[in-house]
Each structure stands twice: as C-alpha cells, then as structure tokens.
C-alpha cells in the first residue's frame, strides 16, 4: 500500500496510514528532486520516498487545466509507477516473479532501485524516485526484466 505523508509541514508528524509498517510513505518533491516545503519530517521508518508532487498539471471539469501540489499528488504518480512495474512483470512472468512484485517488499525494492544512485537522495535523506533509473527506454525489455528479477532475488 502507498499513502501520502501529509501536507502539514515539519511541525506535524507523518499522517496515518503512511506512518505504518508495510506502507510505502510518499512525500512530494519538485521537478529537480528537492523535497517540498509542506512535507512533514521524514519518519524513522525506511520508507521515505519522494517523487514529483509540485505543480503537476491536472484536468478539471469543462476541459480546464490547473496545477496541483501535495503528497497526495505525489502518491498518485508513485502508484502509476508501481502499476507500470507490475505490468512489466506480468508481460513475462517467467523472468520476473509476479508474486514478489505484488508485495510490499517487491514494490519497495523497485522504488529503492530507482533511488539509489548518487545524487538521488534529497537533502533531508528521503529517497527520490527516478523511474528512468530502472525503466530505461534505451535498454532492451529483456535487460530491464532481468534487472528486476535480480533485484527480487536479493529480497
């Protein structure tokens, strides 16, 4: 499960259910990976992931567009990334164990893999998810699936 951290800033703690174990806590970042000012302080848990959540273009009724910000916006984007990971795993289930991917540990491992390169931590120690670190369009699909399998084998 993924859950938004909160938009109450550093004066408040991470909201429920994002502060629970086995829940991926999602914070907001700007387009450069800097943690949003409205994020709460990182929790003691390891799952302090950030992803784009500021000034994201959103559709409204009547065809209007507006920009939205928040950890809930970031959580929707993180859920979309998780869905792409699951879809990749389902395309070739012999290469990637579906059951491992459909778990907290599986998605967490993929998010960690997307945020472990040098420079992907925000200044306050959150993990900035960069989907292109794993889902590289310049790599063959078999290579990406092999990399995903390798990550899951290390769980």
Q: Model-predicted segments: where are they?
A:
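Extracellular S/T/G-rich loop segment that most often corresponds to the catalytic His/Ser-adjacent loop
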Residues: 4, 13-90
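Short acidic loop-to-helix transition motifs that present clustered carboxylates
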Residues: 8-10
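C-terminal subdomain of the subtilisin-like protease fold in secreted/lumenal serine endopeptidases
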Residues: 87-155
């Amino acid at each position: 499960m993924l859950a938004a951290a909160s938009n109450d800033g550093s004066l408040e703690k991470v909201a429920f259910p994002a502060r629970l174990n086995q829940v991926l806590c999602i914070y907001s970042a700007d387009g450069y990976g800097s943690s949003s000012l409205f994020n709460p302080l990182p929790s003691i848990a390891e799952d302090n992931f950030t992803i784009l959540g500021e000034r994201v273009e959103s559709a409204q009724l009547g065809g209007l567009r507006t920009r939205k910000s928040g950890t809930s916006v970031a959580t929707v984007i993180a859920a979309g990334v998780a869905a792409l990971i699951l879809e990749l795993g389902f395309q070739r289930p012999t290469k990637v164990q579906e059951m491992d991917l459909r778990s907290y540990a599986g998605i967490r491992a993929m998010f960690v893999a997307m945020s472990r390169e040098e420079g992907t931590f925000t200044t306050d120690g959150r993990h900035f998810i960069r989907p292109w670190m794993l889902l590289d369009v310049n790599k063959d699909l078999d290579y990406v699936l092999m990399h995903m399998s390798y990550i899951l084998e290390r769980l």
